[in-house]
Amino acid sequence: MIRITSRSVKGAVNIRSVSTSTVRFNNAPKVVSPPVPPTVKPQGSEIPPPPPPPPKTKKFSLFGFLFKTTLLATVVYGGTLYAATKNDKVMDFVIDKQLPFHEELIDFIENGSTEDLEEAWENLKSKFTNVKLPTKDDIDELTQKLEHRGEDIIKETKKKIASTHIGHKSGTDLTPAEQLQRGVEIESVKKDFAHLPLIELNSDLGKSVDDTVKQTITSFNNFIQSIDASSLANKDDKLVASVNTSVNQLASRLNSLTKDFDNELQKKLKVSQTELFSSFTRKELELTENLLHQFSTEKQQLESKLNQKLNQEIQAARAAISQAASNAVAMVRIEQTKNFEKLVSEKLNEERTGRLANLEKLNDRIIELEKFAEGFETQIVSNHKKAIIHQTVSKLKSLLLAPTAGDKPQPIKPYLDELTKIASDDEVLKLAIKDLSPLVTNESTHSILTNAQLLSRWEQLAPELRSASLLPPNAGLLGHLASIVFSKLLLPVKGIKEDGKDIESVIGRVESSLARGELDIAVEEAANLKGWSRKLANDWVVEGRKRLEIEFLLGLIESESRII
């Protein structure tokens, strides 16, 4: 009876170990946090405020440090290469130190643009878009498949183990009455247990299998070892072998997929490497062509500069040689001229002492005669001009100032043209003729009034002046009639009143001045009239002033002609 009890207890322990291992393999244990006791605040006492939290110290970030360091290095490196394109000393430093990728970056800074950068980015992007790497979802899906298959295998194993124990009950499954009625069973205790085979991968697959698959295989092996540790009677080696075969197939499949992926990746990388190498080769050829073009351009420029400098030096040498030769020839000519002059002077001295003794006196007399002839000719010309000017002026005076009644009217313009030709060298005469021309251009010999004509017109104008002087301001028809009547009653004033300002005194002074030939005084008296009387006398004043101006200009021309 003691044997049975021990066996039943041992079987229960083994079953508990299998069930606990299964639960441990499938489900993780839950962690239950202990209950927090409620806080009790003491009454009647004030709790001091909690101290302020300490300032949070900024933790050191390795990623931030690396990012800032990389950014600073990039800025410094790019700034150095950009400065190298502007400064020759920095360029020499970059070339001497052989900074990495300095040639490509300097060429991109000098000749590159945003379009080139976008094109390079698109090319690089298109090269790597065709390479398809396994995503995390694919790996997780494969891992889940393996785990589900392992769980199915575990479930099948449990079913087979349970089916072996359905046929008989252990001592622990019987009631106490059944145990007393049942006879004593003697069982042989087996000390040697055959262990289930563990899942192992082939040697060629062990190195290339993914870590997730290895972890799954390890979980299966742990489960198999837990089964070995239990006291289950019949163990299905075929099931474990099938699991082992399935896992090996999965591992080989995964290995083949990994190899295919590696081969595809290597092909893509080779294609990318070939394209990059071809692009680098093309860029190298372009740079070589650019350098050769620049070299040829610089060579042509240097050759042109050297040829230009050589031509300038040759021209300067030719000019110097020709100048030296011309100087030498000039010196020879000067020397020959001096010798010739010396010979001529000796001959002249010999002749002077002989037949040409009075040659200098004769030359002086000839020069004096030339000067006298020139002066005499000038005097004759000036006298001729004077005579013509006198004749023209006299003719103009006789025609304009004292015309005879029987003469026909003649134009004045021909006489002015003749004066203009003669007086082209004298400024005063030119100005006088210029002022005289507009006065007499449209006039004839009878259009200029004489003193007698001016006096006659003034006498005709006097009655109108008397009547106009009697008109009140803003006079109407009655005022005009009254002024005409009262002007008839006025008595003429005899004699001259120097200080009189009435109209009779002015008329008397004008008539007296015209009788004496003092036209300027008469015009001045008439010009000083006011009001309606001045308007009536305006035409007479204009004619008088025209005669005065003509007389003055003719007198100026005559006076100037006398001093030419």
From Swiss-Prot:
Its membrane topology: Single-pass membrane protein
Localization of this protein: Mitochondrion inner membrane
GO biological process: cristae formation
Coiled-coil regions, chain positions: 281-380
GO cellular component, one term: MICOS complex
Membrane topology, Mitochondrial matrix segments: 18-61
The family this protein is said to belong to: Belongs to the MICOS complex subunit Mic60 family.
Stated role: Component of the MICOS complex, a large protein complex of the mitochondrial inner membrane that plays crucial roles in the maintenance of crista junctions, inner membrane architecture, and formation of contact sites to the outer membrane. Plays a role in keeping cristae membranes connected to the inner boundary membrane. Also promotes protein import via the mitochondrial intermembrane space assembly (MIA) pathway.
Protein name stated in the entry: MICOS complex subunit MIC60
